[in-house]
């Protein structure tokens, strides 16, 4: 049996991680298994897709680190059938978030919800780093006709 050569200082499983994806069932993506993606309309942010319809989910969930000039060029999830949510996970970022005509500055623990067709825009206003969670899903009207509102 031939002995496997491993470069000194590198782990034997360099190209693997503990992430598990079972289509139409579940996904566990560990930090070392995350891939940085380019998300249209989001600038200066290292975003990772944690879940999407591509693996069977009924929603899209992103996590990312915002750079000093992070901002959106178009509102995230602004289609007529999409509702969205943003949450500032951690960091010292001051994030100006726009939902329609309303703007607020969010810090760690802050969040905003945008009803369908409105979308969420954001801009890092203090140049500090922070992490965010972005979420969007298809809007399903309430059976009694109640309308959602921005939070």
Where are these regions (language model features)?
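N-terminal accessory scaffold of Fe(II)-dependent oxygenases
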Residues: 2-35, 129-133, 142-144
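A short glycine-rich, His/Asp/Glu-containing loop-to-beta-strand
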Residues: 34-76, 82-83, 151
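Short acidic, glycine-rich loop/turn motifs
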Residues: 54, 95-99, 124
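Conserved hydrophobic/aromatic beta-strand scaffold that supports enzyme active sites
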Residues: 47-49, 61-65, 85-87, 103-105, ...
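Short, intrinsically disordered, charge-balanced linker/junction segments flanking boundaries
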Residues: 92, 145-151
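Ligand-binding loop in jelly-roll beta-barrel domains
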Residues: 100-110, 116-143
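N-terminal auxiliary "cap/dimerization" subdomain that precedes the catalytic jelly-roll/cupin core
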Residues: 3, 42-44, 68, 89, ...
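A short beta-strand-loop-beta hairpin characteristic of the jelly-roll/cupin
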Residues: 71-108
């Amino acid at each position: 049996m031939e002995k496997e050569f491993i470069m000194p200082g590198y782990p034997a499983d360099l190209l693997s991680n503990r992430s598990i994806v079972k289509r139409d069932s579940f996904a566990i993506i560990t930090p070392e298994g995350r891939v940085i993606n380019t998300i249209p309309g989001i600038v200066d942010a290292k975003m990772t897709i944690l879940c999407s319809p591509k693996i069977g989910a009924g929603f899209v969930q992103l996590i990312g680190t915002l750079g000093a000039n992070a901002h959106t060029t178009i509102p995230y999830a602004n289609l007529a059938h999409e509702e969205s949510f943003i949450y500032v996970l951690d960091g010292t970022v001051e994030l100006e978030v726009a939902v329609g005509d309303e703007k607020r500055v969010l810090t760690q623990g802050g969040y905003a919800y945008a009803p369908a067709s409105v979308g969420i825009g954001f801009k890092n206003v203090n140049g500090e780093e922070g992490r965010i969670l972005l979420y969007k899903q298809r809007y399903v009207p309430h059976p009694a006709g109640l309308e959602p509102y921005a939070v």
